[in-house]
Amino acid sequence: MHLPPAAAVGLLLLLLPPPARVASRKPTMCQRCRALVDKFNQGMANTARKNFGGGNTAWEEKSLSKYEFSEIRLLEIMEGLCDSNDFECNQLLEQHEEQLEAWWQTLKKECPNLFEWFCVHTLKACCLPGTYGPDCQECQGGSQRPCSGNGHCDGDGSRQGDGSCQCHVGYKGPLCIDCMDGYFSLLRNETHSFCTACDESCKTCSGPTNKGCVECEVGWTRVEDACVDVDECAAETPPCSNVQYCENVNGSYTCEECDSTCVGCTGKGPANCKECISGYSKQKGECADIDECSLETKVCKKENENCYNTPGSFVCVCPEGFEEDRRCLCTDSRRRSGRGKSHTATLP
């Protein structure tokens, strides 16, 4: 049995395995703990003024202010920590609910930073900023300004990573205090380093202008005390093909296509053609279409034939009511009737 093409394609699609899903990266224990603490802190903020009358009476201070440290408030905060469908959040909360209650009841005043107490010291899931790894070692450059403030410490704030510096653009070195090629040191002392970009003409530099170049970038050359652009388009051998023209840009050049009417060119448009393609001629300084139908010598040779100009050429067409016959004549089809006679005009 032969299936029709559409049915065969449909059957093939049914048999193909479904596309593999790209596995999303699961949050780390530190990220989960931090998210839980953020929700807890938000819950504290949301309930901070609840059940307070806003006055200053002794009764409010004695009775209503008890809510601030109450288990009722804690319960309201806890109920808003995890969405019902967030399994990992609910699992983490269930495992450590008693510890959060203990912090609320007895440790809150002594250790007001819940993240530091819960995620760093209790669960040992995270590290303080500026430290990394299983033992929360200091990042390169110290915990106060890791990587000299010019990079990111690998594993910063987590129990992972190796503490190495991933430098920001413009910086290099193990502590991110040295400047990359294309940058120079605007400020540097024992604690700070600030690198800024060189002029575009410099590969390396000691200052912000083209006169501060130590080495010129490719496409630039030193003239006296500064790096200046090389005009590649002025080279003895042009860098572009015969059907292109060259445009110089800072540090480089581009090759652009000549106008479609040109045979070789020196710039953009039909006014910059070296020569014109067939069917075009120089008119008022640029290549323009030749109207062959207006020439003194007829280009359409057949009798009754009409000439129509086209860009770069022309067409010869028999008018309506005429047909082109085998003798290269335009025969009036309206007069080809009766007694086998054909009324045609013949060329001399």
Swiss-Prot record:
Disulfide bonds join 30-33, 139-153, 147-165, 167-176, 262-265, 293-307, 300-316, 318-328. This is Protein disulfide isomerase CRELD2. It comes from Cricetulus griseus. Its EC number is 5.3.4.1. It comes from the Eukaryota. A motif (CXXC) lies at residues 30-33, 262-265. It is found in: Endoplasmic reticulum. The lineage of its organism: Eukaryota, Metazoa, Chordata, Craniata, Vertebrata. FU repeats lie at residues 192-239, 252-299.
